[in-house]
């Protein structure tokens, strides 16, 4: 059984809650790996050539190595395309077909685990084999991310410091919900919203069937529900989301694209605040 450890890095960022975090999860507990004998970080491993450690610093190298393999197979892939391949092919279940569980910060040991949500595991547990054959990818341009960053209130000095580019050169901005990510996260759903995502086929021609499970308190529809896509072709999917109750509790669903050649594309859908009517009162 896979269990996600309670960790400070396993958090949804509330400042930009329309972007799912974490993206996905990878092996990071008790990882036995090479270690510099000159390292002084841990006294117990001084002089050793191998060490066993846990944490995000152990999970990240797994993802970095797999990203390098994807780039080797698909040299033209952008960072966004690589991230998409990793996310859309991630596993939702453990090797025995059981649910991935998440540790909770409860004092009672009998209730300190529950099924993981996208806010715990992102798209799921990284699948190395699947990531090298994703079928469809969600790609984005560098300028898309720059437009998003420049649209964050007060971000201009930070963007200039880290990228050397002035936000004044970007005439329009992009909201987090509109980035072409392999996930959909809506922080505040007022009545209804339409979200679009574009997919690009990096495999052979294939026909996809679209299925979904809606988050609690929400109804969704996806158009088209079936499409044929040629190699290299791009298709736009429209996701219509409607609130059916007033709630501030996050709920989760998924959209799946099922290809007739065996490709399966997994898209987590999360909605936090749901409002079915306009609560603004004129005085």
Regions found by a protein language model. Name each.
Residues 1-283:
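Loop-rich non-cytosolic ectodomains and luminal regions
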